[in-house]
Protein backbone atom coordinates (compact mmCIF):
# COMPACT_ATOMS: atom_id res chain seq x y z
CA UNK A 1 0.00 0.00 0.00
CA UNK A 2 1.40 3.41 -0.95
CA UNK A 3 1.13 6.31 1.44
CA UNK A 4 0.22 9.90 0.66
CA UNK A 5 3.85 10.90 0.12
CA UNK A 6 4.42 8.08 -2.38
CA UNK A 7 1.28 9.02 -4.27
CA UNK A 8 2.48 12.58 -4.70
CA UNK A 9 5.91 11.39 -5.80
CA UNK A 10 4.66 9.14 -8.56
CA UNK A 11 1.76 11.07 -10.04
CA UNK A 12 3.70 12.44 -13.03
CA UNK A 13 6.08 9.67 -14.05
CA UNK A 14 6.07 9.43 -17.85
CA UNK A 15 4.34 11.20 -20.71
CA UNK A 16 4.65 10.28 -24.38
CA UNK A 17 4.17 12.13 -27.64
CA UNK A 18 3.71 8.78 -29.38
CA UNK A 19 0.42 8.27 -31.16
CA UNK A 20 -2.39 5.78 -30.77
CA UNK A 21 -3.04 3.94 -34.03
CA UNK A 22 -5.59 1.27 -34.87
CA UNK A 23 -3.61 -1.45 -36.61
CA UNK A 24 -4.49 -4.09 -39.14
CA UNK A 25 -1.98 -6.94 -39.25
CA UNK A 26 -1.51 -8.96 -42.43
CA UNK A 27 0.91 -11.86 -42.58
CA UNK A 28 -0.24 -13.78 -45.64
CA UNK A 29 2.63 -16.28 -45.47
CA UNK A 30 1.12 -17.66 -42.26
CA UNK A 31 -2.52 -16.82 -43.11
CA UNK A 32 -2.63 -14.30 -40.26
CA UNK A 33 -5.11 -11.43 -40.51
CA UNK A 34 -6.10 -9.16 -37.61
CA UNK A 35 -8.31 -6.06 -37.62
CA UNK A 36 -8.74 -3.16 -35.17
CA UNK A 37 -5.74 -3.99 -32.97
CA UNK A 38 -4.59 -1.19 -30.62
CA UNK A 39 -1.16 -0.05 -31.81
CA UNK A 40 1.13 2.89 -32.39
CA UNK A 41 4.35 4.01 -30.72
CA UNK A 42 2.58 5.77 -27.88
CA UNK A 43 0.33 2.81 -27.15
CA UNK A 44 3.17 0.31 -27.02
CA UNK A 45 5.31 2.65 -24.90
CA UNK A 46 2.49 2.97 -22.37
CA UNK A 47 1.90 -0.79 -22.47
CA UNK A 48 5.57 -1.38 -21.72
CA UNK A 49 5.35 0.97 -18.76
CA UNK A 50 2.15 -0.75 -17.57
CA UNK A 51 3.84 -4.17 -17.58
CA UNK A 52 6.40 -2.80 -15.11
CA UNK A 53 3.84 -0.84 -13.06
CA UNK A 54 2.38 -3.31 -10.61
CA UNK A 55 0.64 -0.63 -8.53
CA UNK A 56 -2.40 1.48 -9.39
CA UNK A 57 -0.71 4.71 -8.28
CA UNK A 58 2.24 4.04 -10.60
CA UNK A 59 -0.09 3.31 -13.52
CA UNK A 60 -1.86 6.62 -12.95
CA UNK A 61 1.51 8.31 -13.34
CA UNK A 62 1.53 7.29 -17.02
CA UNK A 63 0.10 10.11 -19.15
CA UNK A 64 -0.90 9.87 -22.80
CA UNK A 65 -3.35 11.23 -25.35
CA UNK A 66 -5.57 9.09 -27.56
CA UNK A 67 -7.20 10.84 -30.51
CA UNK A 68 -10.57 9.28 -31.30
CA UNK A 69 -12.21 9.63 -34.67
CA UNK A 70 -15.74 8.75 -35.75
CA UNK A 71 -14.84 5.06 -36.26
CA UNK A 72 -13.16 4.39 -32.90
CA UNK A 73 -14.09 0.84 -31.73
CA UNK A 74 -15.87 0.65 -28.36
CA UNK A 75 -14.07 -2.57 -27.44
CA UNK A 76 -10.75 -0.74 -27.73
CA UNK A 77 -11.95 1.90 -25.23
CA UNK A 78 -12.71 -0.85 -22.71
CA UNK A 79 -9.30 -2.40 -23.33
CA UNK A 80 -7.45 0.88 -22.76
CA UNK A 81 -9.49 1.75 -19.65
CA UNK A 82 -8.59 -1.61 -18.09
CA UNK A 83 -4.90 -0.65 -18.00
CA UNK A 84 -5.56 2.00 -15.34
CA UNK A 85 -3.43 4.75 -16.89
CA UNK A 86 -4.09 8.48 -16.98
CA UNK A 87 -5.30 8.42 -20.57
CA UNK A 88 -7.08 11.42 -22.06
CA UNK A 89 -9.36 10.86 -25.05
CA UNK A 90 -9.65 13.71 -27.55
CA UNK A 91 -12.64 13.41 -29.84
CA UNK A 92 -12.89 14.71 -33.37
CA UNK A 93 -15.71 12.96 -35.17
CA UNK A 94 -15.07 14.94 -38.35
CA UNK A 95 -12.09 12.66 -39.01
CA UNK A 96 -11.25 8.97 -38.93
CA UNK A 97 -9.04 7.54 -36.22
CA UNK A 98 -5.41 7.21 -37.30
CA UNK A 99 -5.09 3.74 -38.80
CA UNK A 100 -2.11 1.74 -40.03
CA UNK A 101 -1.27 -1.54 -41.72
CA UNK A 102 1.49 -3.83 -40.48
CA UNK A 103 2.39 -6.24 -43.25
CA UNK A 104 5.21 -8.63 -44.08
CA UNK A 105 6.84 -9.19 -47.44
CA UNK A 106 9.80 -10.84 -49.17
CA UNK A 107 11.64 -14.06 -48.48
CA UNK A 108 12.92 -12.59 -45.20
CA UNK A 109 9.34 -11.87 -44.06
CA UNK A 110 10.41 -8.27 -43.40
CA UNK A 111 7.88 -6.18 -41.47
CA UNK A 112 6.58 -3.05 -43.20
CA UNK A 113 4.17 -0.33 -42.10
CA UNK A 114 2.04 2.26 -43.83
CA UNK A 115 -0.62 4.72 -42.70
CA UNK A 116 -4.12 4.11 -44.02
CA UNK A 117 -5.59 7.38 -42.70
CA UNK A 118 -4.00 10.77 -41.86
CA UNK A 119 -2.00 10.94 -38.61
CA UNK A 120 -2.37 13.57 -35.89
CA UNK A 121 0.80 14.55 -34.04
CA UNK A 122 1.02 15.42 -30.34
CA UNK A 123 3.13 18.36 -29.18
CA UNK A 124 3.97 20.23 -25.97
CA UNK A 125 1.01 22.60 -26.26
CA UNK A 126 -1.26 19.55 -26.55
CA UNK A 127 0.18 18.16 -23.31
CA UNK A 128 -0.39 21.44 -21.48
CA UNK A 129 -3.93 21.98 -22.79
CA UNK A 130 -4.82 18.37 -21.91
CA UNK A 131 -3.04 17.79 -18.58
CA UNK A 132 -2.21 21.29 -17.34
CA UNK A 133 1.02 23.17 -16.64
CA UNK A 134 1.59 21.61 -13.19
CA UNK A 135 1.73 18.08 -14.58
CA UNK A 136 4.34 19.07 -17.17
CA UNK A 137 6.43 20.87 -14.53
CA UNK A 138 6.38 17.76 -12.31
CA UNK A 139 6.96 15.21 -15.08
CA UNK A 140 9.81 12.79 -14.35
CA UNK A 141 10.45 11.65 -17.95
CA UNK A 142 9.33 12.59 -21.46
CA UNK A 143 9.20 9.76 -24.02
CA UNK A 144 9.63 11.19 -27.51
CA UNK A 145 9.19 9.31 -30.77
CA UNK A 146 10.19 11.68 -33.57
CA UNK A 147 12.87 12.96 -35.95
CA UNK A 148 15.93 14.88 -34.82
CA UNK A 149 14.60 18.24 -35.99
CA UNK A 150 11.26 17.70 -34.26
CA UNK A 151 13.02 16.54 -31.09
CA UNK A 152 14.91 19.84 -31.01
CA UNK A 153 11.64 21.75 -31.40
CA UNK A 154 9.99 19.80 -28.57
CA UNK A 155 12.97 20.31 -26.25
CA UNK A 156 12.94 24.05 -26.96
CA UNK A 157 9.20 24.17 -26.31
CA UNK A 158 9.61 22.26 -23.02
CA UNK A 159 12.29 24.65 -21.81
CA UNK A 160 10.13 27.60 -22.85
CA UNK A 161 7.03 26.51 -20.95
CA UNK A 162 8.49 24.88 -17.84
CA UNK A 163 7.84 26.99 -14.75
CA UNK A 164 10.75 25.45 -12.84
CA UNK A 165 13.88 26.52 -14.74
CA UNK A 166 16.29 24.86 -12.30
CA UNK A 167 15.57 21.24 -13.15
CA UNK A 168 16.61 19.63 -16.42
CA UNK A 169 13.90 17.70 -18.26
CA UNK A 170 14.74 14.02 -18.81
CA UNK A 171 14.05 13.09 -22.42
CA UNK A 172 14.01 9.45 -23.49
CA UNK A 173 14.23 9.72 -27.24
CA UNK A 174 13.32 7.05 -29.75
CA UNK A 175 14.44 8.46 -33.12
CA UNK A 176 12.04 7.96 -36.00
CA UNK A 177 13.49 4.90 -37.81
CA UNK A 178 13.40 6.22 -41.38
CA UNK A 179 15.16 9.44 -40.32
CA UNK A 180 17.87 7.81 -38.20
CA UNK A 181 20.62 7.61 -40.81
CA UNK A 182 23.80 9.32 -41.96
CA UNK A 183 21.87 11.98 -43.90
CA UNK A 184 20.22 13.11 -40.65
CA UNK A 185 23.27 12.67 -38.42
CA UNK A 186 23.72 16.41 -37.82
CA UNK A 187 20.16 16.81 -36.52
CA UNK A 188 20.57 13.86 -34.17
CA UNK A 189 23.98 15.01 -32.96
CA UNK A 190 22.55 18.49 -32.29
CA UNK A 191 20.08 16.89 -29.88
CA UNK A 192 22.72 14.73 -28.22
CA UNK A 193 25.09 17.67 -27.70
CA UNK A 194 22.48 19.59 -25.66
CA UNK A 195 23.50 20.21 -22.05
CA UNK A 196 20.33 21.99 -20.90
CA UNK A 197 18.37 18.71 -20.86
CA UNK A 198 19.28 15.11 -20.08
CA UNK A 199 18.76 13.05 -23.22
CA UNK A 200 18.79 9.25 -23.32
CA UNK A 201 18.92 8.25 -26.98
CA UNK A 202 17.67 4.80 -27.96
CA UNK A 203 18.00 3.66 -31.57
CA UNK A 204 18.19 0.01 -32.52
CA UNK A 205 21.39 -1.53 -33.87
CA UNK A 206 20.36 -1.36 -37.52
CA UNK A 207 19.40 2.32 -37.23
CA UNK A 208 22.65 3.08 -35.40
CA UNK A 209 24.68 1.40 -38.12
CA UNK A 210 22.99 3.62 -40.72
CA UNK A 211 23.45 6.67 -38.49
CA UNK A 212 27.22 6.28 -38.62
CA UNK A 213 27.23 5.46 -42.33
CA UNK A 214 28.39 1.88 -41.80
CA UNK A 215 25.75 -0.41 -43.29
CA UNK A 216 22.02 -0.86 -43.70
CA UNK A 217 22.30 -4.37 -42.27
CA UNK A 218 21.67 -5.09 -38.62
CA UNK A 219 24.75 -6.20 -36.63
CA UNK A 220 24.42 -9.89 -35.82
CA UNK A 221 26.88 -10.35 -32.95
CA UNK A 222 27.31 -8.83 -29.50
CA UNK A 223 30.86 -7.80 -30.43
CA UNK A 224 29.56 -5.80 -33.40
CA UNK A 225 26.92 -4.15 -31.21
CA UNK A 226 29.48 -3.22 -28.54
CA UNK A 227 31.74 -1.65 -31.17
CA UNK A 228 28.74 0.31 -32.41
CA UNK A 229 27.85 1.44 -28.88
CA UNK A 230 31.34 2.89 -28.39
CA UNK A 231 30.77 5.21 -31.35
CA UNK A 232 28.28 7.18 -29.23
CA UNK A 233 30.96 8.28 -26.73
CA UNK A 234 32.08 11.49 -28.46
CA UNK A 235 28.76 11.81 -30.30
CA UNK A 236 27.02 12.89 -27.08
CA UNK A 237 27.45 15.54 -24.41
CA UNK A 238 29.08 14.02 -21.32
CA UNK A 239 25.79 14.10 -19.38
CA UNK A 240 23.72 12.37 -22.05
CA UNK A 241 23.33 8.61 -22.47
CA UNK A 242 22.37 5.95 -24.98
CA UNK A 243 20.53 2.66 -24.87
CA UNK A 244 21.36 0.60 -27.95
CA UNK A 245 18.55 -1.89 -28.61
CA UNK A 246 19.92 -5.03 -30.23
CA UNK A 247 16.84 -7.19 -30.85
CA UNK A 248 17.41 -10.82 -29.87
CA UNK A 249 20.78 -9.82 -28.38
CA UNK A 250 19.13 -7.55 -25.80
CA UNK A 251 20.45 -4.05 -25.12
CA UNK A 252 23.64 -2.16 -24.32
CA UNK A 253 23.58 0.86 -22.01
CA UNK A 254 26.07 3.69 -22.54
CA UNK A 255 26.29 5.75 -19.36
CA UNK A 256 27.04 9.40 -18.81
CA UNK A 257 30.77 10.19 -18.88
CA UNK A 258 32.50 9.78 -15.52
CA UNK A 259 36.13 10.63 -14.66
CA UNK A 260 37.19 7.23 -15.98
CA UNK A 261 34.93 7.44 -19.02
CA UNK A 262 31.57 5.90 -19.85
CA UNK A 263 30.44 2.41 -18.86
CA UNK A 264 29.04 -0.05 -21.41
CA UNK A 265 26.78 -2.77 -19.99
CA UNK A 266 25.00 -5.57 -21.82
CA UNK A 267 21.57 -6.86 -20.78
CA UNK A 268 20.23 -10.00 -22.51
CA UNK A 269 16.82 -10.06 -24.16
CA UNK A 270 14.01 -11.54 -22.06
CA UNK A 271 13.54 -14.47 -24.45
CA UNK A 272 17.19 -15.03 -25.34
CA UNK A 273 16.84 -18.68 -24.23
CA UNK A 274 13.18 -19.04 -25.24
CA UNK A 275 13.10 -17.72 -28.81
CA UNK A 276 10.22 -20.04 -29.74
CA UNK A 277 7.91 -17.84 -27.63
CA UNK A 278 8.57 -14.80 -29.82
CA UNK A 279 5.71 -14.49 -32.32
CA UNK A 280 5.74 -10.87 -33.53
CA UNK A 281 8.31 -8.10 -32.88
CA UNK A 282 5.78 -5.30 -33.52
CA UNK A 283 5.95 -2.78 -30.68
CA UNK A 284 8.96 -4.42 -29.05
CA UNK A 285 11.15 -1.32 -29.28
CA UNK A 286 8.41 1.08 -28.16
CA UNK A 287 7.47 -1.12 -25.20
CA UNK A 288 11.14 -1.52 -24.24
CA UNK A 289 11.36 2.25 -23.91
CA UNK A 290 8.08 2.52 -22.02
CA UNK A 291 9.31 -0.04 -19.48
CA UNK A 292 12.69 1.68 -19.42
CA UNK A 293 11.17 5.15 -18.98
CA UNK A 294 8.97 4.37 -15.98
CA UNK A 295 11.77 2.41 -14.30
CA UNK A 296 14.28 5.21 -14.87
CA UNK A 297 11.75 7.75 -13.59
CA UNK A 298 11.41 5.73 -10.38
CA UNK A 299 15.05 4.73 -9.79
CA UNK A 300 17.37 6.89 -11.96
CA UNK A 301 19.27 3.63 -12.59
CA UNK A 302 20.30 2.73 -16.15
CA UNK A 303 20.79 -0.88 -15.07
CA UNK A 304 17.36 -1.34 -13.51
CA UNK A 305 15.70 0.52 -16.37
CA UNK A 306 17.49 -1.70 -18.92
CA UNK A 307 16.35 -4.84 -17.12
CA UNK A 308 12.76 -3.59 -17.09
CA UNK A 309 12.91 -2.52 -20.73
CA UNK A 310 13.89 -6.03 -21.77
CA UNK A 311 11.16 -7.56 -19.60
CA UNK A 312 8.49 -5.27 -21.07
CA UNK A 313 9.56 -5.99 -24.64
CA UNK A 314 9.55 -9.71 -23.89
CA UNK A 315 5.88 -9.63 -22.92
CA UNK A 316 4.86 -7.56 -25.95
CA UNK A 317 6.40 -9.86 -28.58
CA UNK A 318 4.77 -13.06 -27.28
CA UNK A 319 1.69 -12.62 -29.50
CA UNK A 320 0.27 -10.72 -32.45
CA UNK A 321 -1.25 -7.48 -31.20
CA UNK A 322 -1.24 -6.62 -27.51
CA UNK A 323 -0.75 -8.99 -24.55
CA UNK A 324 -3.70 -10.33 -22.59
CA UNK A 325 -4.18 -8.38 -19.35
CA UNK A 326 -5.96 -9.48 -16.18
CA UNK A 327 -6.58 -6.34 -14.07
CA UNK A 328 -7.46 -8.38 -10.97
CA UNK A 329 -4.41 -10.64 -10.94
CA UNK A 330 -2.31 -7.95 -12.66
CA UNK A 331 -0.87 -10.45 -15.12
CA UNK A 332 0.20 -9.99 -18.72
CA UNK A 333 -0.24 -13.20 -20.69
CA UNK A 334 -0.87 -14.88 -17.33
CA UNK A 335 2.40 -13.77 -15.70
CA UNK A 336 2.94 -11.07 -13.06
CA UNK A 337 5.77 -8.57 -13.33
CA UNK A 338 7.42 -10.06 -10.23
CA UNK A 339 7.45 -13.52 -11.81
CA UNK A 340 8.83 -12.08 -15.04
CA UNK A 341 11.54 -10.31 -13.04
CA UNK A 342 12.47 -13.55 -11.26
CA UNK A 343 12.57 -15.42 -14.58
CA UNK A 344 14.72 -12.78 -16.27
CA UNK A 345 17.28 -12.59 -13.47
CA UNK A 346 17.52 -16.39 -13.21
CA UNK A 347 17.97 -16.77 -16.98
CA UNK A 348 20.41 -13.90 -17.43
CA UNK A 349 22.59 -14.59 -14.41
CA UNK A 350 22.60 -10.90 -13.47
CA UNK A 351 23.41 -10.49 -9.80
CA UNK A 352 20.64 -8.40 -8.28
CA UNK A 353 18.63 -8.81 -5.11
CA UNK A 354 15.11 -9.40 -6.42
CA UNK A 355 13.37 -8.01 -3.36
CA UNK A 356 15.40 -4.79 -3.34
CA UNK A 357 14.98 -4.30 -7.07
CA UNK A 358 11.23 -4.94 -6.94
CA UNK A 359 10.84 -2.63 -3.94
CA UNK A 360 12.61 0.20 -5.79
CA UNK A 361 9.95 -0.02 -8.51
CA UNK A 362 6.91 -0.27 -6.24
CA UNK A 363 7.64 2.25 -3.49
Curated annotation (Swiss-Prot):
Ranges that cross the membrane: none
Coiled coil: none
Signal peptide: none
CDD domains with a match to the protein in the record: MAK32
Disulfides per UniProt: none
Function summary: Necessary for the structural stability of L-A double-stranded RNA-containing particles. Necessary for growth at 37 degrees Celsius as well as for maintenance of the killer plasmid.
Protein name: Protein MAK32
Record lineage: Eukaryota, Fungi, Dikarya, Ascomycota, Saccharomycotina
Amino acid sequence: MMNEEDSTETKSLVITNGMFIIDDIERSKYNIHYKNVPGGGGTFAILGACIISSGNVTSKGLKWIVDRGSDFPKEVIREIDSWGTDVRFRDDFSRLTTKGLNYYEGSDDLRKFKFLTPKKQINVDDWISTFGQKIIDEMHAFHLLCSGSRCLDIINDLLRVKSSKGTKPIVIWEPFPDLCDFDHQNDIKSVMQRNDVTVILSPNAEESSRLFGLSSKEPTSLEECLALAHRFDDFMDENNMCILRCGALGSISVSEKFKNGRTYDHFPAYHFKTQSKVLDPTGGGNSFLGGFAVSYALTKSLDIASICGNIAAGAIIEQFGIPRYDPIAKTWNGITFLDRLKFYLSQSGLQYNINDLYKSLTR
